[in-house]
Amino acid sequence: MEKNDKDPDHDDKSKGDEKGDVVSDAHPSDDAHHQDGISNENVDVVGNAETDHQDPGDNNVDKVSQGEEAPEIRQTLESLSEELDQFLPTLSLHMEEHKDSTEEKGEDGYFQIPQFVGKFLDLFEEKLSKYDSGEPKTVWYQDPEEVSSLLEAVDRVSKLMGLLLNTKSCLDHHESLINHAGSIQQRAMAFLEDEFRIILEESVTKESVVVTDDSNSQRRSTADQQDHQNDVVVSQDHDQMLVPECGDQEIEYPGYPEDVVVVLRKIAEKMKAGGYGWECREVYLVGRRNILMRTLKQDCEFEKVSIDEVQKMSWDTLEREIPIWNKTFKDCSSLFFPGELKLAERIFPGDEGNLFCIVTHGLAIQFLGFAEAVAMTRRSTEKLFKILDIYETLRDSFPAMEELFPEELRSELRNEVTSARSRLGETAIHIFCDLEHSIKSDSSKTPVPGGAVHPLTRYTMNYLKYSCEYKDTLEQVFKSHSKMEREEEEPVESGNSAFASQLMRIMELLDGNLETKSKQYKDIPLSCIFMMNNGRYIVQKIKGSAEIHEVMGDTWCRRRSSELRNYHKNYQRETWGKLLGFLGHEGLMHNGKIVKPNLKERFKSFNATFDEIHKTQTTWVVNDEQLQSELRVSITAVMIPAYRAFMARFGQYLDPGRQTEKYVKYQPEDIEDLIDQLFEGNTSSSSTATARRRT
């Protein structure tokens, strides 16, 4: 590099200019702005300052000529920075003045570069070496003055390089200086790039935010709340709907303190001004993507999975992944994505949209791919509620997420969501309608012991009850995504939605299936008990769900209750009507006298028949306490008055003592006690009716 030692006077002349900033060639629009600020007044001031600055030098020359040793003038990076700040406008002015002549003649004349420029570069290089020497790198950016000093020095080097590279005389005569300055600039930018990465990774602080997941809160508050790792379980053997607890949750966004954001923004500005904006952006993009994914994994247990991986998952595994997906999608929509947009805006103002999209767009597409993959898995009834959960999450949370993206990406994401929701909706409809097919195909020939509620009834009603907890969503799904043709079916009743009509169709099929299964019992009374058990269970489930009751209506419930009363009457007639026949007077009187042999036989027949009824019907099952009580009360109301009247009328004709004990096995109170033992599902080996004899 050619040192500036040819003409001291030329050095003085080169410094006549304003004190101001000059921007690099990467930003020509700013050059014009600063050039407008140049004035002759400023040039004179700087020129005078330079003249004054040379006086000590002249004295030193005289002293040297007289054999005296000149005192050393200590130059610091700060003092040289001030001199460079005064010189840069001069160089900028020279570049502008000779721009036209350069274009016309291909030359702009020789321009002297002061010696302090090289000295400044040397001292700045020493400063960089100090930072690279192994000392803690966190020190400098925690000190505001050090941050300002370093970044201003970097900015001066970038401005100097921009002017040198755009001034032909400098390119022609100061190649060595340009190479030296360029090397230092590259080193400085590499240092800032590393520091930007370190600060980005190591200065993350978690900002706690409380969010309320109130989606479906009304639905879930009405369902039975029990601890379970899965979201929904519909059991064929139990009456529980297992759903998760919901409410306020505290989630943490991986952000930065304000002072750290300021440092990151300043570094980004200086790197961009020096022509290294792309490198800074890349560091930011990679860093924030990693931080975001790490946070989602640690706090939400979310991990990226491909469509192929989703489709290969067992349902047990996928069932655990779906609630994680739902929570992560909601958290990204309400906190993480808005946080990323705000952070990009604070560090890269004016370019936040592009950076935000690059950080989050891939994750958004991953979310939607998961949803579509779930919809494409093999259909089964237990998947319905998980699929509806995903559908609701997309429906309720995507609009807020969508608004964060620019229009061109917004349209793409909207199309992806529409596609995913369509697949989910169609799958949900098929699964719900598969319940109809499962009822039709259930042809089990083994009757349920004791006439209890059939597992198909329990499963279907639990399924329908919880389905109706999603009633609004299912109504929307059937309306928006149903492509099923039912030309062979009767038209939908006026005023009923497609979902309501499908639900009523399922109820009709269940009724018909139960009627068929009741015929599997050879004992007609037990068949009646079976229909009463299942009918009461259905009615109670419907009355216990406002949503399903709204669909089925009061008329349906009244009609079903009437059918239950008919089964009750049939049971009572078939069982207790025969027993009441033994308590009649016919055949016991002849010519006004009691026929004792007939009376004794009548008591024996009554006892044997009652014992058989008791033995059999204590094994029958009526789990509904109200129905069990109603049956016992109605039996007691019929049997006890009749038996008590029969005993009062004919018991006196049996001889007291052994004869009475032999034929009068039960007192009315004993009969009442034994009736209260019916329908307990008692399968013990005892076949003898026992009751405490009352005296």
Curated annotation (Swiss-Prot):
Organism: Arabidopsis thaliana
Listed result of changing S605D: Phospho-mimetic (PM) mutant with constitutive inhibitory effects on pollen tube growth
Gene Ontology cellular component annotations, sorted alphabetically: cytoplasm; cytosol; exocyst; nucleus; pollen tube
Keyword Transferase: no
Post-translational modification: Phosphorylation on Ser and Thr residues promotes its ability to repress pollen tube growth and to regulate cellular architecture at the pollen tube tip.
Name the UniProt record assigns to this protein: Exocyst complex component EXO70C2
In-chain residues carrying the UniProt-annotated modification Phosphothreonine: T212, T446
Null mutant phenotype: Partial male-specific transmission defect due to aberrant pollen tube growth.
SUPFAM superfamilies in UniProt: Cullin repeat-like
Keyword presence, Lipoprotein: no
Tissue specificity remark: Expressed in anthers, pollen and root trichoblast cells. Also observed in anther tapetum.
Gene Ontology biological-process entries: exocytosis; protein transport; regulation of pollen tube growth
Effect of T212E: Phospho-mimetic (PM) mutant with constitutive inhibitory effects on pollen tube growth
Basic and acidic residues bias spans: 1-36
Coiled-coil stretches: none
PTM sites of type Phosphoserine: S215, S217, S494, S605
Family membership noted in the UniProt record: Belongs to the EXO70 family.
Molecular function in Gene Ontology: phosphatidylinositol-4,5-bisphosphate binding
Assigned keywords, A-Z: Cytoplasm, Exocytosis, Phosphoprotein, Protein transport, Transport
Subcellular locations according to the entry: Cytoplasm
Function field: Required for optimal tip growth of pollen tube; dose-dependent negative regulator of exocyst function in pollen tube growth and cellular architecture at the pollen tube tip, probably by modulating membrane trafficking and exocytosis dynamics.
PANTHER family: EXOCYST COMPLEX COMPONENT EXO70C2, EXOCYST COMPLEX PROTEIN EXO70
Principal place of residence: cytoplasm
Assembly and binders: Interacts with ROH1A and ROH1D independently of its phosphorylation status.
